[in-house]
Each structure stands twice: as C-alpha cells, then as structure tokens.
C-alpha cells in the first residue's frame, strides 16, 4: 500500500481511475470496513485503484477521542482489506476548504470515479458538507457516490465512541463485536521489577502510550502472538496495588503459561477476549500468585472450548 501525506494530483488508476473510501477511520470498526470494502469491491469490478482518503490530527487533539490503534497497525489493517493507496494529509491542510473545494480536490488528486462514505460523513469547513451535498456535487461530474448505512450493534449505530465506552466498562465482547475483531495491543515489552519471575509466573510488561484508550482496570483472558504462534494468556491492567504505591503508573502485565523465552524489546500482539475481575490489593504475595494462576487456568479453558 502506497502512503501519501500531502495532497497532490496522483493520477491513481490511470484511465480507469479510482474508488475512494472517505472517513476518519480511527478504529477500523465494522462500519469503517463496510465503507472500505465497498470501495475495494467497486475498484476490482471496474479495474480501478482502491483508495482510502482520511486525515491526520495533531497528537494533542482531543476532537476524536483517544486512540484505538497505532498508526502502524492501522496501516497494516487497511492494507489487508485490499487498499492500494492511502492518502492522509494533516487536518490543517483541509480544514478550511469549502465542501466544493474538498470534493473537487479529492476527485482531482485521486482521479476518482467513485466515492464511498458512511451516512454520517461530513466534510469541508465547519463540517458543512453532507452525503446529499456530495451527491449533488458529483453528479454533474459523472462521479458515482455510494453512501453506506451505519453498522448496527444491539440496535444502535456502531461508533468508535461506543467502542471506547465498552472498553472503559470492561465489556470486551461488545467492543470486539463492534470492531469486527478482538481488541488488541502491540506495544514494546520492557523490563519490569521482576516480581512475576520471583513468584514463578514471569510476565511480559507493556506500557500504553499516551493518548491510547485504556480498558477498565482488571484481569483479562487474553491470547498472545509470539512469532506465528498464539498462546492463551492472562493479562492484568492497572496500577499493581499489591506491590506499587504509585497509583499514577499504569502497567499491562501478561502471563503466558508454558512460554519461557526472552521477549524484551519485541512487540507481541495481545488480544483481549474477556474481563475476569477488577484489580485488587492482596494481603500476601501468595494470594497474588493464586490469582494469576487462576486467571491463567481460565484462559487455557477458554481457548480449549
């Protein structure tokens, strides 16, 4: 997948042009996938190039909520859907455009023959553009517009905000259903205090980068990918109240039964599948170890079913 960070005429798809999926696509949930898949399928049917057009917000911008995916994982996921070209200019580059300027710019820069968006898509300065205006602007130019209905979960529209709320509440099945895949993290393993190894339950320690959405603190059934293999695992997310007096430091510790290798400096994928229990302060380290062992057993049983 080719990635472009600035607007410029690209002549994508040559004489056959391109089909462009438009949106912010922050979580690549089932609604986002419907829009992207629509553009990819249209492009394949017409010999055109499948394209995603999105935009990049400043790191400190809170307009769209905390992040669900890293930039690298987002790119990999979009590429896996069959997208060949990914345009992602800075928001500052497009925020002052009128709806007309925005649409004409997309058509010109992407050599677009078809535009795909969700029914809640807005564009142009002050979000003045709507799907209906998009149709009106594109019709005289012979550009097809396809507006996808919002995906539904439990009879309500799917959104990244709902996914964040589900994660905050520890409702992993709901988050995963709306994402269309298990919620997962892929952060670098760093050295911890070594307590897990002392207890006989060595863990991998990962830190959530600033700006990422945190699930509810607690113990989770997870599975961890190391190389090409998946392992049942148990993950504790929180401030380690039994051994840590600094409640501002959040850690993500995963115990992988049966794995003994060195993962420091690597970035294994940890998928979240079920919330088991809230974080708590144990009176003894033996109680802490028993909790970890129990969670690991639950994880192994979960994936054996």
Give a label for each model feature.
Residues 2-10, 87-88:
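Short acidic-hydrophobic, aromatic-tinged amphipathic segments that line or gate anion-handling sites
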Residues 21-23, 53-54, 86-90, 114-119, ...:
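Short beta-strands and strand-loop turn motifs
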Residues 9-65, 70:
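N-terminal catalytic cores of NTP/NDP-binding nucleotidyl/phosphoryl-transfer enzymes
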Residues 59-141:
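N-terminal Rossmann-like or analogous alpha/beta NTP/dinucleotide-binding catalytic cores
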Residues 9-13, 93-96, 152-156:
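A short acidic, often aromatic-flanked loop/helix-cap motif at beta-alpha or helix-coil junctions
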Residues 138-238:
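Glycine-rich, Lys/Arg-enriched anion-binding loops that position phosphate/diphosphate groups
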Residues 29, 78, 115, 175, ...:
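Residue-level signal for inorganic ion chemistry
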Residues 192-305:
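Phosphate/ribose-recognition catalytic cores of enzymes acting on nucleotide-derived substrates
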């Amino acid at each position: 997948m080719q990635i472009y960070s600035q607007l410029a005429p690209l002549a994508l798809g040559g004489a056959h042009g391109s089909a462009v999926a438009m949106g912010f696509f922050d979580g690549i949930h089932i609604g986002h996938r419907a829009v992207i898949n629509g553009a990819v399928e249209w492009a394949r049917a017409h010999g055109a190039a499948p394209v995603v057009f999105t935009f990049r917000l400043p790191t400190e911008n809170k307009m769209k909520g905390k992040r669900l995916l890293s930039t690298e994982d987002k790119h990999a996921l979009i590429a896996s859907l069959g997208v060949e070209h990914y345009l992602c200019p800075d928001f500052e580059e497009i925020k002052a455009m009128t709806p007309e300027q925005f649409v004409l710019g997309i058509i010109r820069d992407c050599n677009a023959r078809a535009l795909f968006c969700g029914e809640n898509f807005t564009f142009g300065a002050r979000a003045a553009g709507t799907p209906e205006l998009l149709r009106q602007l594109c019709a005289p130019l012979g550009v097809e517009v396809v507006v996808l209905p919002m995906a539904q979960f439990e009879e309500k529209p799917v959104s990244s905000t709902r996914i964040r709320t589900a994660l905050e509440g520890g409702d992993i099945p709901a988050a995963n259903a709306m994402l269309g895949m298990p919620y997962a993290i892929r952060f670098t393993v760093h050295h911890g205090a070594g307590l897990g190894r002392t207890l006989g339950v060595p863990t991998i320690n990962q830190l959530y980068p600033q700006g990422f959405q945190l699930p509810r603190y607690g113990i989770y059934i997870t599975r961890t990918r190391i190389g090409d293999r998946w392992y049942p695992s148990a993950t504790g997310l929180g401030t380690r109240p039994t051994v840590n007096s600094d409640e501002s430091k959040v850690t993500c510790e995963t115990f992988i039964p049966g794995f003994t290798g060195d993962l420091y400096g690597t970035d294994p994928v940890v998928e979240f599948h079920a919330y088991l229990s809230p974080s708590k302060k144990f009176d003894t380290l033996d109680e802490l170890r028993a909790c970890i062992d129990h969670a690991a057993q639950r994880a192994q049983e979960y994936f054996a079913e």
